[in-house]
Regions:
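Conserved SAM/SAH cofactor-binding pocket of Class I
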Residues: 186-273
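SAM-dependent Rossmann-like transferase core, predominantly class I methyltransferases
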Residues: 130-204, 208-210, 214-218
């Protein structure tokens, strides 16, 4: 029995459905209407705010313009700083309010949907070639599907970062991150691991939540004989394997799919959890 989530909509009184993809594990939208270049942005914004998703049928570049128009309308709705009665009383309330606003923003922007063919091509005018970006995130396709434009743009950005990589001076090389794996754009924690004194006889170290493998690589480069890097994400482990192989450190690092700590004890444990 196929339990994959499916998106349903109707066109000319005919029911349609397609596989629904969401890396955030969001459920398929219950209300879906077709939209194209003729739909005014105000109308699209109203529908999105009311919980109706827009399955785009027009020009792809105009879909991007529509997403930008939705962003502008959301920005105008943001409460202005300094307005009386709107300031949160505590930092906790401010944090909660910010998270709430960000969640609502993501929900509305995620209402603009794009159709895909089984081979990850987009059947819209002026659509870019996103096959490799989608393949890296979704894997091989088996049937046509629908995903949000916002998610697609994230996939494209991640694909570009994966190709380009991030220069890590401590390694004299680059780290290439996969979609869904934390990218080491900020180097403070890497420099800390690269420069902090190692404990005596540090022959073994644990890198908890190894992600891209950057800290495991730094420890291996510093002379730690064996590093055990753990992660629960298959993507992270595949990413770390590629990076450590490229940096010629894979022989010193044992990557394990483990919930936090591996078996045994180590004199050195490093961890840089995502914020």
């Amino acid at each position: 029995m196929n339990t994959s989530p499916r998106l349903h909509w109707s066109e000319a009184d005919t029911a349609h459905d397609a596989l629904w993809r969401s890396e955030a594990a969001l459920a398929p939208h219950k209300r879906v209407v077709l939209a194209d270049d003729r739909m005014p942005a105000d109308r699209a914004y109203k529908l999105a705010c009311e919980g109706t998703a827009l399955l785009w049928q027009g020009d792809f570049q105009n879909a991007r313009h529509m997403l930008q128009a939705l962003m502008r309308r959301l920005d105008r709705q943001q409460p202005r700083k300094g307005k009386p009665g709107q300031a949160p009383d505590t930092p906790a309330q401010a944090f909660h309010q910010h998270r709430q606003q960000q969640g609502q923003r993501a929900h509305i922007l995620g209402m603009l949907l794009i159709p895909f063919n089984a081979d990850h091509t987009i059947p819209l005018r002026r659509a870019p070639d996103v096959r490799q970006a989608c393949l890296e995130a979704y894997g091989p396709g088996t049937e046509a599907y629908v995903a949000s434009l916002r998610e697609l743009l994230g996939l494209i950005g991640a694909h570009e970062w994966r190709k380009k990589g991030v220069e890590v001076p401590a390694l004299k090389g680059r780290i290439h991150t996969h979609y869904g794996v934390f990218s080491p754009l900020r180097g403070e924690y890497i420099d800390l691991v690269a420069q902090a004194p190692l404990p005596p006889q540090a022959e073994l170290a644990f890198d908890i939540g190894t992600g891209s493998g950057v800290l495991a690589a730094v420890l291996a480069q510093r002379g730690v004989a064996r590093v055990i890097g753990t992660d629960q994400s298959d993507r992270a482990l595949a990413c770390a394997t590629e990076n450590l192989t490229r940096l010629k450190r894979i022989g010193q690092v044992d990557l394990q799919k483990v919930d936090l700590f591996p078996e045994g004890r180590a004199p050195l444990v490093v961890c840089n959890p995502p914020s």
